[in-house]
Design a protein with these regions (language model features):
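Acidic/glycine-rich phosphate/pyrophosphate-binding loops and surrounding catalytic core
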Residues: 2-205
């Protein structure tokens, strides 16, 4: 994916999410690695794709290793948004072995999860054949919505609403309580705050 077309990912938000993930996994310390791996041992390794995928999550993985230990060297061997085949190299890491072991699972979690979303999205876009846009929903992992929606864009999809606050989408429960689809649409248009030009959309089950 050309740099000019790469989706934007808020660096402040990304840093916050990575810190939260590391706190969740490491807590006060990696007890096993501290007790088992010699302090002076150095290591290196290469992350490789285990199957065909669209790569997403490199920025998160890089920050994981940097936060765990600034001495770790992370070198990207593939581009964010690139199609990779099984066995293709993603990145190379070198430095203190303890730190590599402590950081690897969190980094892999970001890469695997976001690449999975990007790959599935890219496959959906290909099947659509340009006849329609492929958009996401609010059915996201709590706390990871922004990152997951970023992965959708990496895969060539489009974002729909970020939350309940930035779009009007009338679903079955809404129009049933409003007295019908027409009544719900009219009410939504009438009650738009200060005439805000938000599109009013209705969820459908058939076309």
């Amino acid at each position: 994916m050309p740099e000019s077309r790469k989706p934007f990912l808020d660096p402040v938000l990304l840093l916050r999410e990575v810190r939260r993930a590391l706190l969740e996994d490491i807590g006060p310390g990696d007890l096993t690695t501290i007790r088992v791996v010699p302090h002076s041992l150095r290591g290196r390794g290469t992350l490789r794709a285990k199957e065909r995928l669209v790569l997403a999550g490199l920025p998160a993985a890089r920050i994981v290793f940097r936060l765990v230990d600034p001495r770790l060297r992370f070198v990207s061997l593939a581009r964010e948004g690139a199609w990779l085949g099984k066995g293709d190299a993603v990145a190379r890491i070198s430095g203190p072995a303890r730190s590599i072991l402590t950081a690897e699972r969190t980094a892999l979690n970001f890469l695997q999860h976001l690449s999975g979303i990007a790959t599935y999205t890219a496959d959906c876009v290909a099947r659509a054949g340009g006849r329609c846009a492929v958009r996401d929903t609010r059915k996201t992992t709590p706390g990871l919505r922004r990152l997951e929606k970023y992965a959708v864009r990496i895969g060539g999809g489009e974002n729909h609403r970020t939350g309940l606050y930035d779009g009007i989408l009338i679903k079955r429960n809404h129009w049933r309580m409003a007295g019908g689809v027409g009544a719900a649409v009219r009410a939504a248009r009438r009650r738009s705050r200060r005439g805000a030009a938000l599109p009013v959309q209705v969820e459908v089950s058939t076309l």
